[in-house]
Amino acid sequence: MRFSSQTSSDGVTEQFFTLGEIPGVLWTPEDACGTRPLILLGHGGGQHKTAPGTVARARHYAAEGFAVVAIDAPHHGDRPKDEEFGRITAELRAGIAAGQSPGALVAGMHSHLASQAVVDWQAILTAVQRLDQVGVGPVGYCGMSMGCGLGIPLIAAEPRIRAAVLGLLGVHGLAEDAGRITVPVQFLVQWDDQMVPRDQCLALFDALASAEKTLHANPGKHADVPSFEVGSSLRFFARHLS
């Protein structure tokens, strides 16, 4: 893991790094030392590790004592994009423009990314937990939309993850992995989501095998998640990662 920059403000330290070809950012409380809970933060489709919502959420968590890490998903942000991914995203945009339901199209894109994303996250988790200011503490995952689509296969495969905040995605292509998830989950649904049909979101929630799972449903479209849900997710992680 090679760090390229470090800044601190408002009690939070932000460090940019690369691990092999994976670019990422680590947020920790300023002057942090010793083991603490770690949250893996997955960004949405077409976004990147320093999208405004990702940074705001990460800083909120870090200000309360958590370590938080975000990486660019395959073919996003500072990572190279291949021709196949370009073809898939072009088909997705064309399908949505033609009025097709995006569920199956989005699932195809996530499937193309998921196997590499899982390997990337597992490598990042191992590397970050070797740092003195993070250590081998409890781990959570937070991801909406594509962050959920890539997070579900990760959580199903990675026993170090003990709790997750997910949502804004349907069940297409995810039922089998969701059925392997037994950790506590907080799941968000936007009731008027124009990208993900409500019944598909609810079907994904239902497919999760977690004995403890809660559904947070709010009115509004895909990007209209109320800001108070960040605080709610913080309390969820504080309960399960303390």
List the predicted regions and their residue ranges.
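N-terminal cap/lid segment of alpha/beta-hydrolase-fold proteins
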Residues: 1-34
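Short beta-strand element of the alpha/beta-hydrolase
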Residues: 34-44
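Serine-hydrolase catalytic machinery in alpha/beta-hydrolase-like enzymes
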Residues: 44-130
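Short alpha-helix in the alpha/beta-hydrolase fold that links the catalytic acid
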Residues: 54-55, 183, 197-206
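Primarily recognizes the serine-hydrolase "nucleophile elbow" in alpha/beta-hydrolase
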Residues: 116-180
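Short beta-strand/loop motif that positions the catalytic acidic residue
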Residues: 181, 187-189, 193
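Acidic catalytic loop of the alpha/beta-hydrolase fold
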Residues: 191-196, 223-224
